[in-house]
Amino acid sequence: MKEYKDTLNLNATTFSMKGNLSVNEPKTYAKWQEQQAFKRMQARKDNHGDFTLHDGPPYANGHLHLGHALNKILKDIVVKREYFKGKKIYYTPGWDCHGLPIEQQILEQLEKEKTSLENPTLFREKCRDHAKKFLEIQKNEFLQLGVLGDFDDPYKTMDFKFEASIYRALVEVAKKGLLKERHKPIYWSYACESALAEAEVEYKMKKSPSIFVAFGLKKESLEKLKVKKASLVIWTTTPWTLYANVAIALKKDAIYALTQKGYLVAKALHEKLAALGVVDSEIVHEFNANDLEYLKALNPLNQRNSLITLGEHVGLEDGTGAVHTAPGHGEEDYYLGLKYNLEVLMSVDEKGCYDEGIIHNQLLDESYLGEHVFKAQKRIIEQLGDSLLLEQEIEHSYPHCWRTHKPVIYRATTQWFILMDEPFIQNDGSQKTLREVALDAIEKVEFVPNSGKNRLKIMIENRPDWCLSRQRKWGVPLAFFIDKRTNKPCFESEVLEHTAKLFEERGCDVWWEYSVKDLLPPNYQDNATYYEKVMHILDVWFDSGSTFKAVLEDYQGEKGQSPSDVVLEGSDQHRGWFQSSLLIGCILNNQAPFKKVITHGFIVDEKGEKMSKSKGNVVSLDKLLKTHGSDVVRLWVAFNDYQNDLRVSQTFFTQTEQHYKKFRNTLKFLLANFSDMDLKNLERSHNFSPLDHFILESLETISAGVNSAFEEHDFVKGLNVLMAFVTNELSGIYLDACKDSLYCDSKNNEKRQAIQMVLLATASKLCYFLAPILTHTIEEVLAHSQVLRIFLQAKDVFDLKDISVSEKLHLKEFKKPENFEAVLALRSAFNEELDRLKKEGVIKNSLECAIEVGEKALCENLVEELLMVSFVGIAREKLSETPAFTLFKAPFYKCPRCWRFKSELENAPCKRCEQVLKER
């Protein structure tokens, strides 16, 4: 038998079944860097247009986790897909280098070293070194994911030129009249001792006291109402703000009920409050809220006046319908205060402790001085005495600092804001507010998924003014001078441009290093004593939000086009980078800086829970790469519905590895079986069989499906189409049917050569579709197949292009076999009968069979190939009978070479094999 085995076309390929990815990938990625693969990609011009993906910057702090991998791999797949389509691609990775997390790292480091660093320049130098260190670490970790981009010249928000660009964007905001300094309540992180923008706040559950407090009406107010006693009942979960109460807001036109015991609440809520025991149940009088406006009550905590007002924000779903109002500690309170000219009381310091203002304004007694507001709440509640009607504890959603994860407070301070509702001049000469321009711009942007559009619209519709200033050191300074003569900022072009040039040449450290005189242009230096520096820094969201200007516009197209074609980030960036970029783009250019927004979900564990070290459910990216390799991680990303949260566990990666092996083993089979092709056969036409036409038509159909899905960035849909084809039509039908010809026909057999061309075309399509995802693996495929490289005119993966199968194979059309579906139905019924006969021990395999088919119109050759029987239509010993067909024992002997029962003599080759042996 051995001599016959040696005569078969059992071709081998050097492409291994085992990828050994964790060992081989780093070598490939190092080679790509050495050969400057991305520059080569950018140099290829196929005249199919340009494509720019603008990178939202990760933070230059810490190592990468699986969330980073998800984001960067998705971006890489999108960019490579456009590249393989023939577009000139632009992708400049970048890093967000300023901000609080790095400051905290340095402060912790200094604390461990038991040293302090008051010099801001030296402190900033340490921050810069920290960012540089982790930027390089993350850069190398991204490269190990197979991600390609302009990593030789990435953008860094701490580069001098970049800092100058950020500042110039700020200058444009100021020149358009949208930058104002205001004293108003904003989110304040006492843990960071800094203001926060809305994007820097996350909501988590928190337990808070829930109290109902009676504010007794003053004597003159009682007289106006013609009642002897009446107290408005308020409800609050922030008792610490009661010291700053100056008003109570009611709902306009609502009816308020006065109970027998003298408590005044919204009638719509009376029954609920009576059930709780807050007020008594008997109503003795009713008043319209409008008749209560401008009456006065007394704050039971400090006996100060509290004006009764009407507020649009007052609801009748919860509480009492009477809202405690402290303009120093709430945005809605603040705007109501503007309407009623209310006093803004705010006596809480940067650390969240009561300051001396409580004594000067007689708001609280001095025992509260220096006490943290949350700690003081218990005493404040006790101090209310009989005015406290009910105390409970509730758990509710409460704003927390996104960096320290500690609760934040609302605190009125003087900060710099971008105004959302101030009209400014547009490019066409009209005037619109930033909110209006942004909402208009959103309508012109495509969102994937589409729900992202409405999400961003709602956020823009409801967002407050953007608080830009931060009381920190590591960032781009809000580099303006205040003219002490007018107490207004100096927005003179000469001064602003001089500052920008200094930043560009020497970095913005000069704002701390240089005196006012040295920072001013020569024409202003004689009056330096009249100016003082603003010492706040910019919100880091302004840094990252202006990256489109610094990367795309300032380089005048060298690094891509603005607006960019795509931005792609996690869904949390609707309130972060998407929003800050949109607002700055609308100020600078009256349009969004992107054409399409793609968002992905978050990484969660297999139960759908958020990953955390405390839960012990964190999956290590480094461990995944060492266990499976980056191509498997990349395939896992692509094989998931990234628009939702991605569940991850070792089980999911094991499943992905099976998908990877299926693709790899299929490619290995294809490579092996066209490896002995005569290269002359690549250019000539072939006589393709009905079965060849079937698989080629299937290939064309699924190619359209995969392309359509990938165009919509629906990679999981496209991969499922591809995997179904590989598993069902290709492996399950075609390859099985072709093995006899591939292994046993002569090498120059026309049928076999036609099959090889089909395999070659199929491998080409698989490579094209998988290259953006499994780039290393497809690089490996091409390296191990000269035939495929010549067929595709590609020396490596970066030369890949899509092919037209019909053109490559010189076919005008694909002719699907007649009655093919009937043959497949016959095959299915045959396999069921075959399994029964095998179980009964009647036969061992299908080659022992001959078949007689009831439907005479079916092509006998096709039936023989697809059913893998030895004969069709020659009867001998009947094995079984069904309505559709009859099975017989094959009438001849088993060929020792091809194993088909076609030999006329025992232990002798069949006629076909005999002829092949003669030709050898």
From Swiss-Prot:
Q: Which residues take part in binding L-isoleucyl-5'-AMP?
A: E569
From what superkingdom does this record's organism come?
Bacteria
> Its catalytic activity?
tRNA(Ile) + L-isoleucine + ATP = L-isoleucyl-tRNA(Ile) + AMP + diphosphate
Task: Please provide, alphabetically and separated by semicolons, the GO molecular function terms listed in this UniProt record.
Answer: aminoacyl-tRNA deacylase activity; ATP binding; isoleucine-tRNA ligase activity; tRNA binding; zinc ion binding
Cysteine-cysteine disulfides:
none
Q: Which GO terms describe its biological process?
A: isoleucyl-tRNA aminoacylation
UniProt short sequence motif 'HIGH' region, positions renumbered to this chain:
58-68
EC assignment: the record states 6.1.1.5
What note does UniProt attach to the cofactor annotation? Answer: Binds 1 zinc ion per subunit.
| Binding-site positions, Zn(2+) | C895, C898, C910, C913
Residues that bind ATP: K613
Cofactor (UniProt): Zn(2+)
Against InterPro entries, the record matches this protein to: aa-tRNA-synth_I_CS (IPR001412), aa-tRNA-synth_Ia (IPR002300), Anticodon_Ile_BEm (IPR033708), Ile-tRNA-ligase (IPR002301), Ile-tRNA-ligase_type1 (IPR023585), Ile-tRNA_ligase (IPR050081), M/V/L/I-tRNA-synth_anticd-bd (IPR013155), Rossmann-like_a/b/a_fold (IPR014729)
Q: Where is this motif: 'KMSKS' region?
A: 610-614
Question: Could you name the Gene Ontology cellular component terms for this entry?
Answer: cytosol
Q: How does it assemble?
A: Monomer.
Which comment does the entry carry about domains? IleRS has two distinct active sites: one for aminoacylation and one for editing. The misactivated valine is translocated from the active site to the editing site, which sterically excludes the correctly activated isoleucine. The single editing site contains two valyl binding pockets, one specific for each substrate (Val-AMP or Val-tRNA(Ile)).
Q: Which family does it belong to?
A: Belongs to the class-I aminoacyl-tRNA synthetase family. IleS type 1 subfamily.
Q: What does this protein do?
A: Catalyzes the attachment of isoleucine to tRNA(Ile). As IleRS can inadvertently accommodate and process structurally similar amino acids such as valine, to avoid such errors it has two additional distinct tRNA(Ile)-dependent editing activities. One activity is designated as 'pretransfer' editing and involves the hydrolysis of activated Val-AMP. The other activity is designated 'posttransfer' editing and involves deacylation of mischarged Val-tRNA(Ile).
Specify the protein name: Isoleucine--tRNA ligase
